[in-house]
Structures are given as structure tokens and as C-alpha cells.
Regions:
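Central antiparallel beta-sheet cores of small beta-barrel/beta-sandwich binding domains
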Residues: 31, 60-62, 83-85
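Helix-adjacent hinge/juxtasegments
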Residues: 67-94
Length: 190
């Protein structure tokens, strides 16, 4: 699948779609044009590769007491961006560039927003599911933010975080809720 340059598409309404098959991979599209892929490497933990028409990045979660996600140019050693995870808010810092806030859009909505430090929304990312499976997501960008050079990296970094969080929640599903396995049958008392 050929990827087209991000600057050549409408950046107001984008969508992430999960690929078919067992591989964990998503494609970011605008209309019929694919602009990026995000693919997890089998057996490599949280390591993922994002590919665009112009660049290839690696993303990885790190830290335990101070969790974070880094994005680097593939094969590079320095961070292009870092998403620092805090209890009530998260922060995206771009190397040599601006910083952004990344947080839930609301308590009951699984959507996330990326805003400037002044509170100006840059992107709204909303996961889409079928049952309990994450199948994609919508990325809505205000017209005033559509020409930001870092927009594609922000969309990839935000989606990476959302997918990891979703998969961690999926791992807990068998332990809770109405779909939880039935407890073993007990023998009747004598």
C-alpha cells in the first residue's frame, strides 16, 4: 500500500483503521488516501514502527515510576517527541519545539484531546470499537490546526498511547464483567 504525503490530503477528518489478520497494525487515512501506518513488532513488547511517505519512526513505552512514550526516527538515538504520563494529565514534548497537553475529553467518553498549553485544541481522537475490540478511531482536527508541521507525529503518538491503553484494558476483561468465565462448579454438600 502506497502512502501519500500528509501535506497533500485533507487533514480535518482522519481515521485510523485496524488491519485484517492477527498482526496489530493500523492505517491512518484521509478519504481514500493512506498517510501513515502504525505496526507493532511481534514479540517486541511495546515497540512499534510508524511509517509515513516521508519518514519512519519507532515508538516505545518506557519507565515504571515515571511512565513515558518516546518517538524516534527509525535507527536514531535521540527522541523526536516524548509523551510523559501523569495521573491527571499527560504532556507531549517535541524536541526543539512546542509542548502539548494530552488528556481525556471527558469522564464518560473514551476520546482524547491534544491541546496547546493555552488550551487551544489541536486534535480530538476518538477510538471506535466493535464489542470490546478496538477497530479504529477518528481524528478530528480544527481547521486552524491542520497546517501544524507536527500534526502527523502528534496523531501517531496519541494513537499509540490509546492502543496500548486499550490492549491493557482488554487483557483484564476475562477477569471482570458479564463476559467473565464462570467460576468452577462446586460439589453439592453431602
Amino acid at each position: 500500500m502506497a502512502l501519500v504525503p500528509f501535506g497533500s490530503v485533507d487533514r480535518i477528518a482522519l481515521r485510523w483503521l485496524r488491519g485484517p489478520g492477527p498482526e496489530t497494525a493500523f492505517t491512518l487515512s484521509s478519504g481514500d488516501a493512506n498517510v501513515a501506518t502504525l505496526r507493532w513488532t511481534e514479540g517486541a513488547g511495546s515497540l512499534a514502527t510508524a511509517e509515513t511517505a516521508d519518514a519512519q519512526w519507532t515508538l516505545k513505552r518506557g519507565g515504571f515510576l515515571s511512565p513515558h512514550i518516546t518517538a524516534r526516527k527509525a535507527g536514531g538515538r535521540s527522541d523526536l517527541a516524548r509523551l510523559s504520563v501523569h495521573l491527571s494529565y499527560h504532556r507531549i514534548e517535541l524536541a526543539g519545539g512546542p509542548s502539548y497537553r494530552f488528556r481525556r475529553a471527558g469522564l464518560l467518553v473514551p476520546a482524547w484531546t491534544i491541546t496547546t498549553d493555552d488550551g487551544v485544541e489541536v486534535a480530538h481522537i476518538e477510538p471506535v470499537r466493535e464489542g470490546r475490540t478496538l477497530v479504529g478511531g477518528a481524528v478530528l482536527v480544527p481547521a486552524a490546526a491542520a497546517d501544524r508541521p507536527e500534526l502527523l507525529l502528534l496523531a501517531v503518538l496519541g494513537w499509540y498511547f490509546i492502543v496500548l491503553a486499550w490492549f491493557e484494558d482488554e487483557a483484564l476483561v476475562p477477569l471482570e464483567g458479564p463476559d467473565a468465565p464462570d467460576p468452577p462448579a462446586r460439589a453439592a454438600p453431602p
